Regions:
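Residue-level preference for the first positions of well-ordered beta-strands
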Residues: 93-95, 156, 189
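Interdomain "pre-motor" coupling segment immediately N-terminal to P-loop NTPase/helicase cores
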Residues: 6-60
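Active-site catalytic microenvironments for nucleophilic, acid-base chemistry
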Residues: 39, 114-118, 181
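Post-Walker A helix-loop "phosphate-sensing" segment adjacent to the P-loop in P-loop NTPases
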Residues: 112-126
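Walker A/P-loop nucleotide-binding motif
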Residues: 91-107
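N-terminal pre-Walker A segment at the start of P-loop NTPase domains
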Residues: 62-85
């Protein structure tokens, strides 16, 4: 009987029950079944969360609490609402602006981890350069639509380090397609060390740059890192 239970559990893909059914006390048959199914569901959920974390390709996070002391929040934002990802529910974007080492990448990673672990959301982390390269490679291989479909399933796309490396013309155009595809359908976090007026250095085309900025800042929030001045916020306000 023991072997038959294991075999049936294996066929039904009830891995926790298969390995542990004999360790649960049998006092009440209904409670016994409830306990087995609860454990099975919990294990499946844990595996799902671990898979989401793996596929998100997030940078390593130390686990230290985030230091908000040098971060200026946009209107209507709170630390809790940012970490809880309220903007993801509303399909809004976040622009994190500040110098190197100001904590932009770290905060975006904390938001992503919470979104995955607490809400089971689909997240993907890219540097802008790595996504552009992946898009170019997929285009050459004829698998661009496959990559687009993967991005289309996301709840949150993180684009890190915008401004560090100028993009190839075709890479910039493909990245614009991704941003347009996400517009009002899923949230994007962009981390950057450049004011909007200098994004043309990355995209290399004033018209394309303006289109990118317009789609990103519509329904978006701005966070200033490292005690930056109000110039970035003012430039954003002029765009609205």
């Amino acid at each position: 009987m023991h072997e038959m239970i294991q075999e049936y559990a294996k066929r039904l893909k009830l891995s926790w029950i298969r390995e542990n059914f004999h360790t649960v006390d049998i006092e009440d048959p209904k409670q016994y079944l409830l306990t087995l199914f609860e454990k099975e569901v919990n294990q499946r959920e844990e595996r799902r969360i671990n898979l989401l974390l793996k596929t998100a390709t997030l940078p390593n996070v130390s686990g230290k609490p985030f230091d908000w002391s040098e971060v200026q929040l946009g209107q209507g934002l709170s630390q809790e609402s940012i970490i809880e990802g309220k903007f993801i529910e509303e399909k809004e974007n976040m622009i994190f602006y500040g110098g190197v080492g100001a904590g932009k990448t770290y905060l975006s990673s904390l938001i992503a981890i919470n979104a995955i672990q607490k809400y089971g959301r689909r997240v993907k982390f890219y540097t802008v350069a790595s996504l552009a390269n992946e898009l170019l490679e997929a285009n050459e291989k004829g698998t661009l639509n496959k990559l687009f479909k993967k991005i289309d399933k996301l709840d949150l796309l993180i684009l890190d380090e915008l401004g560090y490396i100028p993009l190839h013309k075709q890479g910039a155009e493909l990245l614009f397609q991704v941003i347009s595809m996400c517009y009002e359908k899923r949230s994007i976090i962009v981390t950057t060390n450049l004011q909007f007026g200098k994004w043309n250095h990355v995209f290399g085309d004033p018209i394309l740059t303006e289109a990118v900025v317009d789609r990103l800042i519509h329904h978006s929030h701005l966070l200033l890192f490292g005690g930056e001045s109000k110039r970035m916020r003012e430039s954003m306000m002029l765009k609205n």
